[in-house]
Design a protein with these regions (language model features):
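Charged DNA-binding/catalytic regions of mobile-element recombinases
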Residues: 1-160
Length: 160
């Protein structure tokens, strides 16, 4: 799994924060939370959401950058409790986390920037839900997974 957070601007509420977890094998966004503040609680809630959607394999590794939320004692304790190993990008090297960075770039190019501006937090939240759950996981094909959608790839992986 890979995880990161990105900024989304709204007219009324200013900067808001999207935290996501992606399964690198299927390209599926398996956990995401949207908040008005970038906190360790937001990334822990994202992890909880991912765990509702997918049971981690025995030797699961989650990769993140060195952001304070991901290096917090609370986040590390949660990962330890779940027996999930944590790997980190090198300082100042976003390429180490290219999978999730690529998802965020696609999200911004395909949804955020074309929309010009979201009126408020709620409007942004609805648009993100529609993009992630309605389009990205269900309809967006990826050449790296043989032109399947993330949901189709997940189904194949579960059958194997």
């Amino acid at each position: 799994w890979v995880t990161d957070s990105t900024y989304i601007h709204t007219l009324k509420d200013g900067w808001t924060y999207l935290s996501t977890i992606q399964d690198l094998h299927t390209k599926k966004v398996i956990g995401w939370k949207f908040g008005k503040q970038m906190t360790k609680e937001l990334v822990i809630e994202t992890l909880d959401h991912a765990l509702l959607n997918q049971t981690p394999s025995e030797n699961l590794i989650i990769h993140s950058d060195l952001g304070s939320q991901y290096t917090s004692e609370a986040y590390e304790a949660k990962l330890n409790e779940l027996n999930i190993r944590h790997s980190f990008s090198r300082k100042g090297c976003p390429y180490d986390n290219a999978g999730i960075e690529s998802f965020h770039a696609s999200l911004k190019k395909e949804e955020v920037y074309p929309s010009k501006a979201y009126e408020n937090f709620e409007a942004a939240h609805l648009a993100l839900f529609q993009y992630i759950e309605g389009f990205y996981n269900r309809k967006r094909i990826h050449s790296s997974i043989n032109y399947l959608t993330p949901n189709q790839m997940e189904e194949l992986a579960l059958q194997a």
